[in-house]
Regions:
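Extracellular/surface recognition and adhesion modules
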Residues: 18, 42, 49-51, 73
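Extracellular jelly-roll beta-sandwich "head" domains, especially the C-terminal globular C1q domain
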Residues: 36, 61-72, 80-135
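Short amphipathic beta-strand and strand-loop transition segments with alternating hydrophobic
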Residues: 38-44
Length: 135
């Protein structure tokens, strides 16, 4: 990384402070990547976790407003607090099921819900959730 010369009279940052700042930026960020058994990819940067799910499923009779557990996360990917986010859940005809969401419990269970008013058959789940891991 090239160092930028800010010594132009408009900055109050001295050269030693700037060099320290620049060198810290130049350090490589440690990114851990993991793909679980259902093909969901997790990226962990420090404690920040990005979960990206594109799961083709065959889930029959997903009840209205009842949790369905997809998987349980390894401890290092579990959130510090309950995480709830939007999920695109499609039925067997690949039509969107309205009012669908996903949650990740602090115990690691990844659950989906649908609130369409009736029982649905699920064919696909798409979701991206970003959260802070407990550790």
């Amino acid at each position: 990384m090239e160092k930028i010369d800010f010594q132009n009279g408009t900055t109050k940052l001295n050269k030693a402070m700037f060099d320290t700042f620049q060198n810290n930026i130049a350090k490589e960020i440690d990114v851990n990547e993991f793909t679980n058994s259902i093909g969901t990819t997790f990226y962990k940067i420090g404690r920040l976790v990005v979960m990206n799910m594109a799961y083709t499923a065959s889930i029959s009779n997903l009840a209205n407003n009842k949790a369905y557990t997809l998987t349980t996360l390894e401890e290092k990917y579990r959130p510090g607090k309950l995480v709830v986010g939007h999920a695109v859940i499609k039925n067997a005809s690949y039509n969107f099921i309205p009012s669908s969401y996903m949650q990740i419990r602090t115990t690691g269970e990844v659950e989906i819900y649908q609130n369409s008013g009736s029982t649905q058959n699920v064919a696909q789940i798409l979701a991206t959730l970003v959260y802070v891991a407990a550790s």
